[in-house]
Amino acid sequence: MPNLRPFRALRYDVAAADLSKLLAPPYDIISPAERRELLARDAHNIVRIELPADLGAAGAADYATAAATLDAWREAGVMVKDPEPTVTVHEMRWLDAEGSEQRATGLFCRLRLEEYGPGAGVRPHEQTHGGPKADRYALLQATQVNTSPVVFLAGSEPAATSAALLALVDRMPDAEVATTDGVRHRLWICAEAEAAPVLALLSAAPVTIADGHHRYETALRYRAHHAAERRGDADPAWDHLLALIYPLDQSPPALPTHRVIRGRPCGDELLERLAPYAAIERLADVKTLLARMAAPVHLTPGASGSGRIGVFTHGKAAVLSVDRVATGALLDAGLSEGSKGLDVNALEVIIRRAFGDDAATMAADGRLWYSKDAAAAATQVQDEEASAAFLLDAMPAAAISLVAAAGEVMPHKSTYFNPNAPTGLLLSPLEW
């Protein structure tokens, strides 16, 4: 089972600064232009630490500068360490596309690292690639601070866990801030004794990594690097990482990552190749397709996916209704029913059969890329930058946990959670 505990968080002194000017989005979505804007917003914006150069451009000197900057901020009192161990409840509120208010509530705490495997308290759900891990490792080595959390889905019973978590927010928040994406964030800092009931529930079942596989695996590498320093029963801080854990019924929505492809087949030829694996409903135009894919879909209880995939290729728009028998027969026989029911796994089969290569191979040589925006993916086809776009529906968070519980992982870039906790709400120094 996961080992969770309070810790002495490092926070901005909100009494002396405007928190809205100090936060940043997750590092991997910050463009060079946005990074410049964040730096101009406030000299102490967390992007100076989290992304010390444009994404992918940082070198050893940049990481060293980030570490020195953070040390200077601590010395000057810009960031202050909690005097006692605490946990922090984080709530997000936002309006969905229909204008209805949505809410997600999670808990910041410290989680003891452990390797993946049977019986482990931590489970991955997605395959990872190496590049981002090298960058995050260099930053961790230099700063010795977890600057952003790994996000987890709790495996414990949702109703009881949510009740214990929400019992901690029956008072005024300790901090409140709105970010530029329209999300309102509220924080409650809770003492160890106050947090004990919810920590006990969250620790009662394995947790699944929702976002941050690279950061988790980076922390494992960092721990292995320091293993020779371990002394007997010592409990070094580098044995832990910063976690943000959501009960299944309190998490942000798990949204789809669409596939965009360059190359043949395309148009009618592509749709003909898809026919053995799905019923094909042709639509009038891409506008109709985007409206259909934006419409909510109601899943049957326990279903992993809708079975609906949108396709736009050389002016041809269609909705596929996946034939689970046909696609399931081409997946590994040992896969769980939960994995076989995932739309993204059905799409892996469809791409492989239509194009003759798997998605990972096509991504590696530049023939396939990913988009979080369905309209942007379709526009790339309209502008002839790509030959086809495959659009997916969102999946339930419970399906992610189900696949992870079976010891399986989803394809790379299967999903993402949005909105996100901004970087800078709190940090976890690798110290006690």
State where each predicted segment sits.
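Surface-exposed, charge/polar-rich loops and edge strands
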Residues: 1-432
